Amino acid sequence: KEGYPMGRDGCKISCVINNNFCKVECQAKWRQSDGYCYFWGLSCYCTIYQKTPRFGILAPINVEDNVTVTQCLGHLINVMYSH
């Protein structure tokens, strides 16, 4: 599946409209991935693939998002007003 990559602070990686930045961030965390800036969420969003053991082809995997909204709300507000 797809998901949001987390930064060192445990929050989603923030962005405004920079797909290339998000692609680099996603590929740094998961080698075989792609990424873009999800505008409405102001966060990078990744599509991650891994080889399936049966066919040796790439298949999507899930990214867990266990961070609460309140934990990162201040971080999101700072990003919105810093750009």
From Swiss-Prot:
All copies of domain LCN-type CS-alpha/beta, residue ranges: 1-73
Family, as annotated: Belongs to the long (4 C-C) scorpion toxin superfamily. Sodium channel inhibitor family. Beta subfamily.
Keywords, in A-Z order: Disulfide bond, Ion channel impairing toxin, Neurotoxin, Secreted, Toxin, Voltage-gated sodium channel impairing toxin
Cystines in this chain: C11-C72, C15-C37, C22-C44, C26-C46
InterPro entries with a match to the protein in the record: LCN-type_CS_alpha_beta_dom (IPR044062), Scorpion_toxin-like_sf (IPR036574), Scorpion_toxinL/defensin (IPR002061)
Main localization, broad class: secreted
CDD domains: neurotoxins_LC_scorpion
Gene Ontology cellular component terms for the protein in this record: extracellular region
Subcellular location(s) of the protein: Secreted
Protein name in UniProt: Putative beta-neurotoxin RjAa32
Presence of keyword Disulfide bond: yes
Domain notes: Has the structural arrangement of an alpha-helix connected to antiparallel beta-sheets by disulfide bonds (CS-alpha/beta).
Gene Ontology molecular-function annotations: sodium channel inhibitor activity; toxin activity
Organism: Rhopalurus junceus
Pfam family, one: Toxin_3
Superkingdom assignment: Eukaryota
Job of this protein: Beta toxins bind voltage-independently at site-4 of sodium channels (Nav) and shift the voltage of activation toward more negative potentials thereby affecting sodium channel activation and promoting spontaneous and repetitive firing.
Tissue expr: Expressed by the venom gland.
Key word Mitochondrion present: no
